Amino acid sequence: MGRTLENKKSIVAELQETLSQSQLTLVIDYKGLTVAEITDLRKRLRPTGTLCKVTKNAFMRIAVDGNQTWQPLQSFCQETSAFLLVKDDLGGAIKAYQDFQKATKKTELRGGVMEGRSLNADQVKAIGDLPSKDQLMAQIAGAINGVATKLAVGINQVPTSLARGIKAVSEKEAA
């Protein structure tokens, strides 16, 4: 027995809702993956705020139809498609997928869509090479901490230098 019209509409509505919360969508060919491997991919992606959706291409085409941001996604909807819907950590999600791809050697990245632009595999890899959100926050925190440390040392040196100067003058006068 096939899906009911209401069921199909709810699937499309769920896809539209998930897309509205996503910054980047990657399309991969998942042919040859076992259920255990797809589950492993989902586990790797979960900490980065990414969902792995395996759905019919027709549902995804309907979900993005008329939406300028995700319209280019239609060109990737062919054969066996899994959609990686990235909400937060773009670089982390791409790195997690690349690690999975190296481990299984079964999937192929078709491309992605970000801010209404279609991305090829090289462009997606370039985004993945950018530092992750956590790395950027650590770099900023380190820079702020470094400035505060230098300021504290500088403020501490002024009275110390002044005290040394006064002591030297008093010793000179006493002699």
Swiss-Prot record:
It comes from the Bacteria. The keyword ATP-binding does not apply. The keyword rRNA-binding applies. This is Large ribosomal subunit protein uL10. One of its GO terms (molecular function) is structural constituent of ribosome. The lineage of its organism: Bacteria, Bacillati, Cyanobacteriota, Cyanophyceae, Gomontiellales. Keywords: Ribonucleoprotein, Ribosomal protein, RNA-binding, rRNA-binding. InterPro entries: Ribosomal_uL10, Ribosomal_uL10-like_sf, Ribosomal_uL10_bac, Ribosomal_uL10_bac_type, Ribosomal_uL10_CS_bac.
